[in-house]
Amino acid sequence: MKMVSTYTVPAELSHLSAIRHFVTQVVNGYCTDEDFLYDLTLAVDEAVTNIIVHGYYLKPGEKLASGNGTITILIEPFADRMEVILRDHAPQFNPTLNPEPDFSQPIEKRKPGGMGIFLVRELTDRMEYKPLPAGGNELRLVKLFPHP
């Protein structure tokens, strides 16, 4: 039987270290490949940072009035992959529709933003978005286990 590990934290940057620790502890129980662990942990860190900074804050330091300000992380192992589901109550936003940054432009001429989502895409094998019926978001990150 698969075990789903769940962790709910306040949507605050000060909890990123605890989130990384949670992901590391759970994933290490199923896959000890260092690159796999690093990639998945960094992808979760980037996605959660985006949720906190862009979803729950109007501008730096100013939280949204609505929503309960939490993020729930569910990690579910499968035979060939690990899936991480991030649920929040921030305004709905589909990151899978976000265009990739324009790398043909010098960095000083690029439109700001989008690097975190790009990094999450690059570090995972699949990223899926679903708006939650009662409001909020669900982002599923899928990472295939390395071949032996």
Cite the ranges covered by each PLM segment.
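Conserved beta-strand-loop-beta-strand hairpin that lines the nucleotide-binding pocket
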Residues: 1-6, 52-148
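Helix-loop-beta hinge of the Bergerat
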Residues: 2-34
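Solvent-exposed, flexible loop/coil residues
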Residues: 13, 17, 46, 97, ...
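Conserved short strand/loop->alpha-helix "switch" segment adjacent to the catalytic nucleotide/phosphoryl-transfer site
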Residues: 23-45, 109-111
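Hydrophobic residues in the alpha-helical elements that line and stabilize the ATP-binding pocket
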Residues: 47, 51
